[in-house]
Amino acid sequence: MIHTLLRWVFQRLYRIRIEGDSSQFQQSKLLITPNHVSFLDGVLLALFLPIKPVFAVYSSISDRWFMRWLKPYIDFVPLDPTKPLAIKGLIKVIERGQPVVVFPEGRISVTGSLMKVYSGAAFVAAKSGATIIPVRIDGIELSPFGRLAGVFKRRCLPQVTITYLPPTTLPMPEASSARARRALAGERLHQIMMKARMETRPQHTLYQAFLAARSRYGRHSASIADISFNEDSYQGLLKKSLGVSRILQRFTRADEHVGMLLPNATITAASILGASLRNRIPAMLNYTAGAKGLQSAMKAAGIKTIVTSRQFLEKGKLTDLPKQVSEANWVYLEDLKDTVTLKDKLWILFHLLFPARAMLPQKPDDAAIVLFTSGSEGNPKGVVHSHDSLLANVEQIRTVADFTPGDRFMSALPLFHAFGLTVGLLTPLITGARVFLYPSPLHYRIVPELVYDQNCTVLFGTSTFLGNYARFAHPYDFARLRYVVAGAEKLSETTRQVWQDKFGIRILEGYGVTECAPVVAINVPMATKIHSVGLLLPEMESRLITVPGITRGGRLQLRGPNIMKGYLRVENPGVLETPAAENAEGELQQGWYDTGDIVELDERGFCTIIGRVKRFAKLAGEMVSLESVEQLAVKVSPEAQHAASAKSDSSKGEALVLFTTDSQITRDVLLAQARSSGVPELAVPRDIRYVKALPLLGSGKPDFVTLRQMAEEPNSEQSVIEPSIVKQPITNASEPSA
């Protein structure tokens, strides 16, 4: 009677929604592993699970007065965390055929993300051979019974969803000791729970996800700022997005790829959202690529209209671009101000009140954005991502990293770069964190000052950029940083060490590719292995394909929700080439993406990058990693920059060429280091060329196409070059008034 009454009351108060197959609970041995987000989780499960389970409760809780009241209605087993043998009692309960509920996190989440997962629950599952049913509880964390005060906007009676995920098992892992087996089992249960979170994520478009964040964190919550130092709330960003969308639709049509040539600024974020909500597909153009690069991108993606700013072109010394790319219809944001009519203003006002009505019909799987590869190995390709692939990557990041509305992101990587777009814009917007957009990662003195001034807690960049920030930063500039993430190139040991010594900060290395939106793997405080790029993100499948001549690792292929829809190539304009890769048997399989990277995966799943397939040289039949050549040079001269390439050789097929900014490096010095490091003499280049600076792409990565061309040239003074990267100005695009 009491059970029925309470169930009715909770159903009315919280509008409980049950999802999933309830018949799967009819198992002989069952372990239920829910996430833990509020003090009501146990009560909700006791009332709404289709079975009557036994709850594992810490003795510190089971001895409380309120548990005596609940004992007649809820079966529970006291669990003393100070006595490891106590979990044997749970195993006996399961073996008797009684279903058991264990909260693997052991405590209520204070971040909104998964907390640490204890290995006890995993050991129980593995030892008993029980079927695991993950359960997700969503919504109740927003109530006063959650522990997210100051993190999320509180609601008295939020809607609650309880989701039953498909059953799984957890065999006892093989390891050298019982302690290691238990630890591995705990890690695998953590992966099961992360997968459960991914499977229950909302299916939204970019604009819908933005509106959901606006509702969740409060429309007047500060969300974004730029070099103008004017901070916009979610409502302010919505207003600008509606203004851009209203005017942009005059120059474009639905489903059109619209070029965006804009700096890191609030108006760029508004332009992306504004185009997206009216079913236009932003194509993020690289303003460091020059006229030829823009024309290649336009041809590949069928771009006819380019949205930009006169102020940006002027300060960036790019005013000749419109003349050089005259085939495009150039739309200047400054010119839009005078075209806003009373009808436009009324339309914007109406949709500020009813923002969901502004969006044209779209599906999460529809194309959302076009990014372009860096072109480090050839012509840039257009990479088409859906709303779902971008938001899946954001959710993968949120699942492993505890970003909250209390965080502040410093975003200096360009938004035309996948790393800058997803991690530097979409993740903070969806997470409720504030983001400061800065137009250039190359201002090595200014960026640290802004990190300090804006109280930033999250910074990301390439190894090169982070190393230069460390050179010019005051030791206190980075005092508030809690996440510093390096990606896009291998993290140098020098950069890692200087951050540790000067700031006491551990850089977390990650790995990503544009085709994966882009994050694939990342080290986080909960799971870190030095010299690796971390664990693959949840919901990502991987396989390694053997490459002839390469003995370490294999060619990494990936499949998951964050994989692109396909390529747009200059050679086949406007035609979407869906991802596909050959498996070990040579069969072409759709949905798999071949990264072209040689990696190793250890028994825990940590990923170590060996190099790219295209960055191996074949010398007299032997495969030599160009990255290993660069690492050899780094050991000899850690302060300089080095890049290895290959050139044609009539006797060996190929020969190594080392480009370095250290004029004192000689082959004898490299040979001595190679002998002490156990590196074969074959990997020591004979052709060593001094350059003032390496040619770089807009992302900060070395321009290997240019380096290969230079390698084929005779070793002369012509190889002394300046960087090819465009020096980006401190500028902020003008905004149309709405």
Swiss-Prot record:
SMART domains the UniProt entry points to: PlsC
Membrane topology according to the record: Multi-pass membrane protein
CDD domains per UniProt: LPLAT_AGPAT-like
Keyword Methyltransferase: no
A single cellular component GO annotation: plasma membrane
Start and end residues of each stretch annotated as AMP-binding: 233-646
Catalytic site positions: H36
Domain of life: Bacteria
InterPro entries: Aas, AMP-bd_C_sf, AMP-binding_CS, AMP-dep_synth/lig_dom, ANL_N_sf, Plipid/glycerol_acylTrfase
Sequence intervals crossing the membrane: 258-277, 409-433
A biological process from GO: fatty acid metabolic process
Protein name in UniProt: Bifunctional protein Aas
